[in-house]
Amino acid sequence: MTRTPVNVTVTGAAGQIGYALLFRIASGQLLGADVPVKLRLLEITPALKAAEGTAMELDDCAFPLLQGIDITDDPNVAFDGTNVGLLVGARPRTKGMERGDLLSANGGIFKPQGKAINDNAADDVKILVVGNPANTNALIAQAAAPDVPAERFTAMTRLDHNRALTQLAKKTGSTVADIKRLTIWGNHSATQYPDIFHASVAGKNAAEVVNDEKWLAEDFIPTVAKRGAAIIEARGASSAASAANAAIDHVYTWVNGTADGDWTSMGIPSDGSYGVPEGLISSFPVTTKDGRYEIVQGLEINEFSRARIDASVKELEEEREAVRALGLI
C-alpha cells in the first residue's frame, strides 16, 4: 500500500457518535477500501482519557488501513494537514436553554475550530458539520475560515435523507434501493422538508405511487422531522449509530460520487438556487463527482413544497441573524 494516508479529524471523538464513527472510518468505509487513513481525535480536556480508551480499541482492531492516531485538545494540532474534518462535538440543548444561549455556546466551539481549519488544514480540506444546530454551526465555522473556499463547509442532512428513504419504502412496500431522487430541503431541524415530488419508486413517480397528500403532510413529513426525538424517547439516548452512518454516507458520496440517475441531500452554501438566499447553508438536492458537488437545477417546485421550503429557509435566516448579532459571523 503506497498511497499517502488521508488525515481525518473527528471532533467530539469520545462521544457516542464518535464511538460509532471511528471504527467505520478506520475500516475504510468513509473514503474507500483502498485508502489509508490517519485519525486525529479532538476532545475537550476532561474527555481526553476516554478518547485514549477509544484509541486503544482502534489499535486492538488492527485495521490495515489505519496508519496512526493522534489525540489532542488543541484544534490547531487536530486540524494540522487535515483533508477531511468531521465536526461532531457540539453543545447539546439542555432543558430551559434559550436558542440564543445554544447558538452562543456553539459559537464558542465552532468559531475557534473554523479558525484552526483556516490556519492549518490541507488545501483540499472537506468539512462536514454533524453537531447541531448543524447548518448554522457550519456557517459559523465557515465565516472563521475566509481562506478556505466556502463550498468546502457542509452540514449533514443525510440522516434526514436516509430516514425519509425508509419511511417512503415502508409506505410503498418497496426497498430503499428502489427509491431515487429524494430530497431534503432547508434546515436540519423540525422545519426541514423531505420532498418526494421528484423522487421515483422502482421507476415510477413517488408522489403518484403514494397518491396521498394527507399522509405526506400529517405522517411522512412529521415522522422524518421528529425522528430524533422519537429515538430519544424510545432509547433514552440520542441517535448515535444512525448519525454516524449518515456522516459516513455523506463523505463517501461527496468523495466518490452519486450514482447515475440519482442524487443526495447535503447542507451546502446556497448560490441563490430555488430562492434560497445566497450564503445560507441549506439542504439541497445535489449530484457529486470527483470530490465536488452541484445543485440539481430545473426542478419544478409546487405550492405544497414552496411553502415548506420557505418556512425552513426563514428559520435559517433567523439563525443567521442571531449569530450575526452575537458577533459570531
Swiss-Prot record:
<protein>
    <recommendedName>
        <fullName>Malate dehydrogenase</fullName>
        <ecNumber>1.1.1.37</ecNumber>
    </recommendedName>
</protein>
<keyword id="KW-0816">Tricarboxylic acid cycle</keyword>
<dbReference type="InterPro" id="IPR001236">
    <property type="entry name" value="Lactate/malate_DH_N"/>
</dbReference>
<feature type="active site" description="Proton acceptor">
    <location>
        <position position="188"/>
    </location>
</feature>
<feature type="binding site">
    <location>
        <position position="163"/>
    </location>
    <ligand>
        <name>substrate</name>
    </ligand>
</feature>
<dbReference type="InterPro" id="IPR022383">
    <property type="entry name" value="Lactate/malate_DH_C"/>
</dbReference>
<dbReference type="InterPro" id="IPR010945">
    <property type="entry name" value="Malate_DH_type2"/>
</dbReference>
<dbReference type="Pfam" id="PF02866">
    <property type="entry name" value="Ldh_1_C"/>
</dbReference>
<keyword id="KW-0560">Oxidoreductase</keyword>
<feature type="binding site">
    <location>
        <begin position="130"/>
        <end position="132"/>
    </location>
    <ligand>
        <name>NAD(+)</name>
    </ligand>
</feature>
<dbReference type="InterPro" id="IPR001252">
    <property type="entry name" value="Malate_DH_AS"/>
</dbReference>
<dbReference type="InterPro" id="IPR015955">
    <property type="entry name" value="Lactate_DH/Glyco_Ohase_4_C"/>
</dbReference>
<dbReference type="InterPro" id="IPR001557">
    <property type="entry name" value="L-lactate/malate_DH"/>
</dbReference>
<feature type="binding site">
    <location>
        <position position="106"/>
    </location>
    <ligand>
        <name>NAD(+)</name>
    </ligand>
</feature>
<dbReference type="GO" id="GO:0030060">
    <property type="term" value="F:L-malate dehydrogenase (NAD+) activity"/>
</dbReference>
<comment type="similarity">
    <text>Belongs to the LDH/MDH superfamily. MDH type 2 family.</text>
</comment>
<dbReference type="InterPro" id="IPR036291">
    <property type="entry name" value="NAD(P)-bd_dom_sf"/>
</dbReference>
<dbReference type="Pfam" id="PF00056">
    <property type="entry name" value="Ldh_1_N"/>
</dbReference>
<dbReference type="GO" id="GO:0006108">
    <property type="term" value="P:malate metabolic process"/>
</dbReference>
<comment type="function">
    <text>Catalyzes the reversible oxidation of malate to oxaloacetate. Exhibits remarkably higher catalytic efficiency for oxaloacetate reduction than for malate oxidation in vitro. Highly specific for NAD(H). Can also use NADPH for oxaloacetate reduction, but catalytic efficiency is 97-fold higher with NADH. No activity detected with NADP(+) and malate.</text>
</comment>
<feature type="binding site">
    <location>
        <position position="132"/>
    </location>
    <ligand>
        <name>substrate</name>
    </ligand>
</feature>
<feature type="binding site">
    <location>
        <position position="113"/>
    </location>
    <ligand>
        <name>NAD(+)</name>
    </ligand>
</feature>
<dbReference type="GO" id="GO:0006099">
    <property type="term" value="P:tricarboxylic acid cycle"/>
</dbReference>
<feature type="binding site">
    <location>
        <position position="99"/>
    </location>
    <ligand>
        <name>substrate</name>
    </ligand>
</feature>
<keyword id="KW-0520">NAD</keyword>
<feature type="binding site">
    <location>
        <begin position="12"/>
        <end position="18"/>
    </location>
    <ligand>
        <name>NAD(+)</name>
    </ligand>
</feature>
<feature type="binding site">
    <location>
        <position position="93"/>
    </location>
    <ligand>
        <name>substrate</name>
    </ligand>
</feature>
